Amino acid sequence: MAFFNVFKAVLCAYFISVVFGHGITLKPHQRECFYENLRNNDQMSVTYQTNVGGDQLVSMSIYNPAGQIMHQEVPNSMAQYSFTVKNPGKYMYCFYNDALDGESKEVLFNVHGVIYISDEDLDANNPLLGKVRQLHDTISKVKHEQEYFVARERIHRNTAESTNDRVKWWSILQTVILVSVCVFQIFYLKRLFEVKRVV
């Protein structure tokens, strides 16, 4: 029984995976930064998508512990960047609203990290652990893709509803204009055929 408890503890430690889902609102020209303490061979992935606001273009930058830019994303409505840590320390990732349109933007982002534990810490002869780790990684990737598609679906649904509203109001306006023109033509033609008598 003690073997199973130790096995569970080792398995949990081996597959520590951290996932965060966040949403922030960036005002024009605002920069919002977040920090992660990472060790050698840890893996980190940042995915973001703008949901609401103007042209929906946001920049993302990732800085290493020395404060140097590792990656800079051009203004985009959605992007993803993954990397494996070579230098341990505090990594910073920032989102910036360039505000080319002067509007606030809502940014949804996920941070996914896999904490690396070396094979020396585990029983390297156990093939089951390798398969479980593979399965865990695959399930995590599927989960993140699903979160990404949910966010995209929300944006597309909002766009479709907005388009439907515009089409509805345009149709109502066309109907009002058509009825007005018909009424005008009826009265105009009626006046044209009236007999004018001289008394």
Curated annotation (Swiss-Prot):
InterPro entries: Emp24-like, GOLD_dom, GOLD_dom_sf
Subcellular location: Endoplasmic reticulum membrane; Golgi apparatus membrane
Transmembrane annotation, as ranges: 169-189
Gene transcribed to yield this protein: emp24
Membrane topology, record value: Single-pass type I membrane protein
Lumenal side: 22-168
Family: Belongs to the EMP24/GP25L family.
Function: Constituent of COPII-coated endoplasmic reticulum-derived transport vesicles. Required for efficient transport of a subset of secretory proteins to the Golgi.
Protein name: Endosomal protein P24B
GO cellular component, one term: Golgi membrane
Keywords from the UniProt entry: Endoplasmic reticulum, ER-Golgi transport, Golgi apparatus, Membrane, Protein transport, Signal, Transmembrane, Transmembrane helix, Transport
